[in-house]
Regions:
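Hydrophobic faces of well-ordered beta-strands that scaffold small-molecule active sites
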Residues: 37-45, 62-66, 90-98, 142-146, ...
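Conserved, mostly hydrophobic/aromatic
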Residues: 32, 64, 95, 120, ...
Length: 564
């Protein structure tokens, strides 16, 4: 299939003026080889301290990825320290995806699937602009998003709520609006996960996952999505630890294991397919290089230079920065990394920085004063927009028993069976269903947590609510309704309430829990466990507000059994 019929002419996403071009060339030409090597790295921080930053800044990295804790002042101080210590301004990056990984001092917004469930591009744009503006207040220049994977394999724990859904046309429409809004507000967007995830239910944090499509199928789906968004000017793409064997074998028919090479170290996927066929002229960043999909493929000393040599311009994260810096330098000396690729990558890195205006910002002015930051975060307008999106996203999947709306007169005594899920990142928002219980009590309900030693009965319970809240999460392998944990033991996991007591399943995470609970007659998908969503869900359960969410995926997992 020819891509010419699918994609607009590629644009130059990193176009800069002559003054900026001169800065790029002057800065690059003044660098030593060691300084150029440093520019290839984006190191990660999570402690917001000068002590943590010191060894990283000594390597003069091109970027710093921020996973903040909950102290805005410490976060700002660490950013200022990094800026002050740098000769070449570092780019600040982040996984800015919403949901329960929203930053603690920023406005809490639904995750990407929650935004898609609003089924309204104006809402998508409003949330994207809100996120971009607050990200700029926090000093972020580059968001590692949005995810443009197609959520086809419902058992995948890593795509799910991080995606815009399973329908390619919706993914493209939503991502187009989201990227335009981010970049118009001064934040570089990033398409991920190249060459496309969502058809393998495994997680590249643990294994090299596989895009199983034929070449023609890929062109019609991911080729169209990436081609269109590249044509619209997205600045960066994240090359992931995902194999695309059909494309490799189209060029190397006898490929064996090499057909399953991660894109991160694949010249064919990064250079030939992404750059030459799709015409991408922006920056390619690797996915996190500590993930199992890459660490399981080849030895680290070979991996480090191979990532850059095979088409990535920046190397994301390191558990041993000094060691990996040494591996990159050794790779240049022993020929695993060519001078041409080093020169090309550093030029593109500096061009991205110039495109974002970092070359002309006074370091003393890059981070606004702390009080100004506080005033610009969680503004009333932003809170209203986020609350509206939170409510708009909540989706009634089914209510075949006509349980809703709930009322204290009929369902006063409520047993709560809850699993809060976990966060990959220590600084993520705290989890808990306290707001749900508070909202129920305020309306006259009497909620109590399940006592696994005293099973609810018709005589003492009017309603059972299952509250589950695991969003798509790295390294989770699979997300499912864990009845052993919910009910307290393997034996009790076999007991079910749905046919004895009115029961409802409320998901504040993945939208596929019905697969493990086909006999649940009432199901609501709310996509994230942030406080506005928790409170707005109760309003919809009681009929105070309508369910308006439109599921971006098939919550019935293609199984007729789940519909009844």
């Amino acid at each position: 299939m020819l891509l010419d019929s699918l994609t607009p002419p590629p644009t130059e996403p990193l176009s800069i003026d002559e003054q900026a071009r001169a800065w790029v060339e002057r800065t690059r030409d003044a660098m030593s080889i060691e300084e150029m090597i440093g520019q290839l790295f984006i190191f990660s921080t999570s402690q917001d301290s000068a002590e943590e930053l010191g060894p990283l800044l000594a390597l003069k990295p091109g970027g710093i990825n921020r996973f903040p804790q909950n102290d805005l002042s410490a976060f700002r101080s660490a950013s200022v320290h990094a800026i002050e210590q740098a000769v070449v301004p570092p780019v600040f990056t982040g996984d800015i995806e919403g949901g329960t990984i929203s930053y603690p001092f920023a406005t809490t917004v639904p995750n990407i699937m929650g935004i898609a469930a609003c089924d309204d591009l104006a809402t998508t744009e409003a949330i994207a602009r809100l996120v971009a503006r607050e990200s700029r207040v926090l000093g972020y220049d580059w968001s590692f998003g949005p995810v443009v994977d197609i959520n086809h394999a419902f058992r995948s724990a890593i795509v799910g709520t991080r995606s815009f859904g399973s329908r390619p046309e919706n993914v493209l429409a939503q991502a187009s609006v989201y990227i335009r809004a981010l970049q118009e507000e001064g934040v570089a967007a990033c398409l991920k996960h190249w060459p496309g995830d969502g058809f393998d239910d495994r997680d590249q944090h643990l294994v090299t996952s596989v895009n199983p499509l034929s070449v023609d199928e890929w062109y019609a789906l991911f080729g169209r999505i990436y081609g269109q968004l590249i044509g619209q000017g997205v600045m960066t793409v994240m090359s992931a630890h995902i194999a695309f064997p059909a494309y490799i074998r189209a060029h190397l028919p006898d490929a064996g294991r090499e057909a399953f090479q991660p894109a991160t170290v694949s010249h064919l996927l990064n250079q030939r397919l992404l750059r030459e066929e799709l015409g991408f002229k922006g920056l390619i960043v690797s996915d996190a290089t500590g993930m199992g999909g890459l660490t399981g493929w080849m030895e680290r000393s070979e991996t480090v230079p191979a990532v850059i040599e095979n088409g990535c311009d920046m190397f994301l994260f390191s558990r041993a920065p000094q060691r990996d810096y040494g591996f990159m330098l050794d790779g240049l000396r022993n020929g695993r990394l060519s001078e041409g690729r080093l020169y090309e990558a550093v030029t593109r890195i500096l061009t991205l920085k110039a495109r974002l205006g970092l070359h002309r910002i006074d370091p003393a002015e890059r981070m606004m004063p702390i009080e100004a930051m506080r005033d610009a975060l969680q503004t009333p307008d932003h809170r209203v927009a986020a609350l509206q999106a939170a409510g708009q996203s909540i989706t009634l999947v089914k209510d075949t028993q006509s349980l809703l709306p709930l009322a204290p007169a009929t369902h006063r005594r409520v047993v709560i069976v809850a699993e809060e899920g976990f966060s990959f990142w220590d600084g993520a928002l705290s989890r808990g269903y306290g707001p749900v219980l508070d909202e129920l009590r305020a309306r006259g309900f009497e909620p109590r947590m399940l006592d696994v030693d005293q099973w609810p009965t018709r005589e003492d319970t009017d309603l059972v609510l299952y509250l589950v809240g695991q969003e798509a999460t790295p390294s989770a392998a699979h997300i499912f309704l864990d009845l052993v944990k919910l009910h307290g033991s393997n034996r009790k996991a076999m007991s079910q309430f749905a046919q004895e007591i009115p029961t409802a399943l409320l998901s504040f995470g993945q939208p596929y829990y019905l697969y493990d609970a086909p006999h649940m007659k009432t199901c609501v998908n709310a996509y994230s466990a942030i406080e506005p969503v928790l409170r707005e869900t109760v309003r919809r359960l009681t009929g105070e507000a309508p369910f308006t969410g439109v599921s971006p995926v098939d919550p019935f997992c293609g199984q007729e059994q789940l519909r009844w």
